[in-house]
Swiss-Prot record:
<keyword id="KW-0170">Cobalt</keyword>
<dbReference type="Pfam" id="PF24621">
    <property type="entry name" value="DHQS_C"/>
</dbReference>
<dbReference type="GO" id="GO:0008652">
    <property type="term" value="P:amino acid biosynthetic process"/>
</dbReference>
<feature type="binding site">
    <location>
        <position position="151"/>
    </location>
    <ligand>
        <name>NAD(+)</name>
    </ligand>
</feature>
<dbReference type="GO" id="GO:0000166">
    <property type="term" value="F:nucleotide binding"/>
</dbReference>
<dbReference type="GO" id="GO:0005737">
    <property type="term" value="C:cytoplasm"/>
</dbReference>
<feature type="binding site">
    <location>
        <begin position="105"/>
        <end position="109"/>
    </location>
    <ligand>
        <name>NAD(+)</name>
    </ligand>
</feature>
<dbReference type="GO" id="GO:0003856">
    <property type="term" value="F:3-dehydroquinate synthase activity"/>
</dbReference>
<comment type="similarity">
    <text>Belongs to the sugar phosphate cyclases superfamily. Dehydroquinate synthase family.</text>
</comment>
<protein>
    <recommendedName>
        <fullName>3-dehydroquinate synthase</fullName>
        <ecNumber>4.2.3.4</ecNumber>
    </recommendedName>
</protein>
<feature type="binding site">
    <location>
        <begin position="71"/>
        <end position="76"/>
    </location>
    <ligand>
        <name>NAD(+)</name>
    </ligand>
</feature>
<dbReference type="InterPro" id="IPR030960">
    <property type="entry name" value="DHQS/DOIS_N"/>
</dbReference>
<comment type="function">
    <text>Catalyzes the conversion of 3-deoxy-D-arabino-heptulosonate 7-phosphate (DAHP) to dehydroquinate (DHQ).</text>
</comment>
<dbReference type="GO" id="GO:0046872">
    <property type="term" value="F:metal ion binding"/>
</dbReference>
<feature type="binding site">
    <location>
        <position position="264"/>
    </location>
    <ligand>
        <name>Zn(2+)</name>
    </ligand>
</feature>
<dbReference type="GO" id="GO:0009073">
    <property type="term" value="P:aromatic amino acid family biosynthetic process"/>
</dbReference>
<feature type="binding site">
    <location>
        <position position="184"/>
    </location>
    <ligand>
        <name>Zn(2+)</name>
    </ligand>
</feature>
Amino acid sequence: MAKQVLVELGERSYPIEIGQNLFSSSEPLARYLQNKNILIVTNETIAPLYLQQIEAMLSDFACVKPVILPDGEQYKTLEQMNTIFTSLLEQNLGRDTVLIALGGGVIGDMTGFAAASYQRGVDFIQIPTTLLSQVDSSVGGKTAVNHPLGKNMIGAFYQPKCVLIDTHCLSTLPKREFAAGMAEVIKYGVIWDAEFFQWLENNVEALKSLDTQALEYAISRCCEIKAEVVEKDETEQAVRALLNLGHTFGHAIEAEMGYGVWLHGEAVSAGTVLAAITSNKLGLVDESIVCRITALLAAFDLPTTAPDTMDFEQFIKHMRRDKKVLKGQLRLILPEGIGQAGIYSDVTDELLEEVISCA
């Protein structure tokens, strides 16, 4: 039986359905698809695995020709967005259209942004197939594409009608992609829930072996935390920024190394360690906290150091373009212990250079 987490945003509230074998029935989605045209957006990797199954599930509804995009962060661009818009226009689809994002974070972000933009807004549904998208990017309404000068710089806040998470999809996920998703899972423990962090420490092998109960609990807990945060601060004016732990450093790594060279979760992992080291140098946490965070990330074979080829100047030029920068001042999300974090705008360049040089 599927577990449901509700994101409560008044008229824009929506359910997250979490379970196994959810692609066998259209029941969770039926209410959003009646009298609608349905355009599925997916990629070349996911289409052979799940597209036929989803089309069969939706056979009672009006599905049109799907959009199949190339796979990878490097294709999260306005050019590929235009492929979605062209398909919508060529098939004469109007505001009675529902877009379905079938894939990972890139597909979800692009489909959501297309839905927010097309004819000033059409409905969309998230069917995330990677761990990272299931626990993070499919929930909360952040949609965007990248720009050569910065990640997720062009986008909108736009909530889905429903999120359908089938944990069975993780059985086809490459190990590297699974590990990248665990960086976001661990983030929730660091910023919000010390008990969950400890549970993760105690269940590394169960998660790595794709134990069904462990996966469903971890995904559900992450979605519960994400829903709680989004309900308090939908457009990231305050507490939602905490979800960006590791991302200011991480986005700099992605932009400098080239999108897709480091997976997003890998960059967030290294960025989380850099944030923890910064906290330690500011006296916010002792070294044992840095060690626990680093050890848990390393247990999932994630990188815990910055790329050897990046120096301070390369980091800082990208970090200064971060969306959290306010009045020219860099704001970092830093752990204050296990289970809590804060926003800090008084970190000097000298300290950051010290952190980056020793990481």
